[in-house]
From Swiss-Prot:
Purpose: Catalyzes the interconversion between glucose-6-phosphate and alpha-glucose-1-phosphate. This is the first step in the biosynthesis of diglucosyl-diacylglycerol (Glc2-DAG), i.e. a glycolipid found in the membrane, which is also used as a membrane anchor for lipoteichoic acid (LTA).
Family: Belongs to the phosphohexose mutase family.
Keywords, in A-Z order: Carbohydrate metabolism, Glucose metabolism, Isomerase, Magnesium, Metal-binding, Phosphoprotein
Disulfide cysteine pairs (residue numbers): none
Organism: Staphylococcus epidermidis (strain ATCC 12228 / FDA PCI 1200)
Pfam family, one: PGM_PMM_II
Protein's UniProt name: Phosphoglucomutase
Record lineage: Bacteria, Bacillati, Bacillota, Bacilli, Bacillales
Residue positions binding Mg(2+): 135, 288, 290, 292
Entry note: cofactor: Binds 1 Mg(2+) ion per subunit.
């Protein structure tokens, strides 16, 4: 079978990537198979069923077409793509295959953000959407995310149904793809300009007027899709006191100026800090390549730098949304089960309804979809730097958050305060939670087995005490059971099943889960206790070095 793949190397679109891989990496592509999971498909470029190339993408596209036409008479699909290698090529392949089966397609004529895609599906009343992106993964990755008619990523059940349509097609080199006629070519349309115009109006309505202040902002797109949309939105709101990190705000599929195009990574802000020091800026904001997540850094008058983690940003944004929506009845917010305790405590402090969902923003979108008319969504977030303030988008949306955060900081600046001061006030009122994420990477087939072994061992040897902290409850989302060790009671977890274990102490919790999009296993620690860093490290060592 390797020879069959070598025969099509020139037309695979991934020749350069394949030739730069080690023999082990090349073999892994031939020995594995990409699967369409709950977060779509994400993988490296290369040859074989386990890699992204012209043929595996075509297989996904054809399976997706069959999935749509099995239940919809005249489907309409929106396709967007980011600034990664082969994103426009993959988008065009998918558009051509869908059109060849008489499916109407709106195809972006340049790179677009993930929030743009979610909004466009809703605005155009499409049946589905496709986003070509691998978020913040390294440059040799890409992916395909699929959205439903509500602008949210497919549910677990719909993802499984789509997966069966893809799998039944067999080997990607043996698939007979339908040809695209001239008439069918006319089914592929550009995305109308009024889609983005209406998106801008929604953001403007959310943010309102940004007050006059001395606030200066530095912004970086980390070579992704958020420029020019962010500068355009800020200008439309009459806020012009920002500077772009020029070296990082041009599309670059290699993400040349950063080791990781991930706003969670402090080093991703190094060039932003240099510019901030030069122009005496107060607030630094960066988005990931597809602009669904963002990070912030704050700089005081003496040039001191303050980094904020996803839970702290989430608490700040929730605090601001609570202020913005004061007097609104039946307010509700959502966060993922691995997000920290600060936002939950803040919601309870202000009598805002609160609910936890599984990791993955589609679960927050599902909760929004099922809200009653009397309930008012004000905020949703995940600790991995994904936030949503108003649900005209049904995925995390950094673009709507950027001007909202700037407005918040501008108001504080006029009071002689910083976000840091606001966060200190929050923790004084509701308690301080320290959060730390340990992320361990295990590549390849052996790495996947290693991750499975760690989860299996942790399940079988779940402790009653860790580093002096008494375990009071254990939630195993794979079995769907919660064990209360204080009352010796077992109850059902009402959320869908997932490969997550969460252990509670009086001081907070830890959670362990494999990543759904990367070859990683993640340990989340959220505790209100002394010597947090030491305890968190000991817990990590006990799990991964035992």
């Amino acid at each position: 079978m390797k020879n069959n793949w070598i025969d099509v190397l020139d037309e695979s679109l991934v020749k350069d990537f394949y030739n730069n891989q080690t023999s082990e990496e090349q073999q892994e592509g031939l020995n594995t198979t990409l699967s369409f999971g709950t977060a779509g498909i994400r993988g490296k470029f290369g040859l074989g069923e386990g890699r992204l190339n012209k043929f595996t993408v075509s297989k996904v596209a054809l399976g997706f077409a069959h999935y749509l036409t099995s239940s919809i008479a005249h489907p309409v699909v929106v396709i967007h793509y980011d600034t990664r290698h082969l994103s426009p090529e993959f988008a065009q392949i998918i558009a051509n295959i869908l059109a060849s089966l008489d499916i109407k397609v709106y195809l972006a004529d340049t790179y677009r953000t993930t929030p743009d895609l979610s909004f466009a599906v809703r605005y155009l009343q499409a049946d589905a959407g496709v986003m070509i992106t691998a978020s913040h993964n390294p440059k040799d990755y890409n992916g395909i995310k699929v959205y439903g008619e509500d602008g949210a990523q497919l549910s677990t059940d719909d993802s499984a149904r789509l997966s069966t349509y893809i799998d039944k097609l067999g080997h990607p080199l043996h698939i007979n793809l339908p040809s695209l006629t001239t008439e069918q070519q006319s089914l592929i349309h550009s995305v109308p300009s009024e889609v983005r115009e209406d998106y801008f109006k929604n953001v403007q309505d959310l943010v309102g007027t940004i007050p006059q202040s001395d606030l200066k902002v530095v912004f970086t797109s980390l070579h992704g899709t958020s420029v020019p949309v962010v500068p355009d939105i800020l200008s439309s709101l009459n806020f012009n006191q920002f500077e772009l990190v020029a070296s990082q705000c041009e599309p670059d599929s290699d993400f040349s100026s950063v080791a990781s195009a991930n706003p969670e990574d402090h080093k991703a802000f190094d060039q932003s800090i240099e510019l901030a020091n030069l122009i005496d800026a107060d607030l630094l904001i960066g988005t990931d390549p597809d602009a669904d997540r963002l990070g912030i850094v704050e700089r005081d008058a003496e040039g001191n730098i303050y980094y904020y983690n996803g839970n702290q940003i989430g608490a700040l944004l929730l605090n601001y949304r609570i202020k913005q929506t004061e007097g609104l009845p039946n307010r509700i917010m959502f966060q993922s089960i691995v997000s920290g305790g600060l936002a939950k405590s803040l919601a309870q402090y202000h009598n805002v309804n609160f609910k936890e969902v599984l990791t993955g923003f589609k679960y927050i979108a599902a909760e929004i979809r099922h809200l009653s008319p009397e309930q008012n969504f004000i905020f949703g977030y995940e600790e991995s730097y994904g936030f949503l303030a108003r649900p005209f988008v049904r995925d995390k949306d950094a673009i709507q958050i950027v001007p909202l955060m700037i407005k918040y900081a501008a108001e504080l600046k006029n009071e002689g305060r910083m976000l840091k001061d606001e966060l200190e006030d929050i923790t004084r009122n509701v308690g301080n939670f320290n959060d730390k994420l340990f992320s361990h990477t295990f590549e390849g087939t052996q790495g996947k087995a290693k991750i499975e072994n760690i989860m299996t061992q942790f399940r079988s040897e779940t402790p009653t005490e860790m580093c002096g902290l008494k375990v009071i409850a254990i939630e195993d989302f794979e079995t769907g059971k919660k064990t209360d060790l204080q009352n010796d009671e077992v109850s059902d977890i009402t959320l869908p099943k997932a490969n997550v274990i969460k252990i509670y102490f009086n001081e907070g919790f830890i959670a362990l889960r494999p990543s759904g999009t990367e070859p990683k296993i993640k340990l989340y620690v959220s505790l209100s206790c002394d010597h947090f860093d030491v305890i968190a490290q000991k817990i990590n060592d006990a799990i991964f070095n035992s």
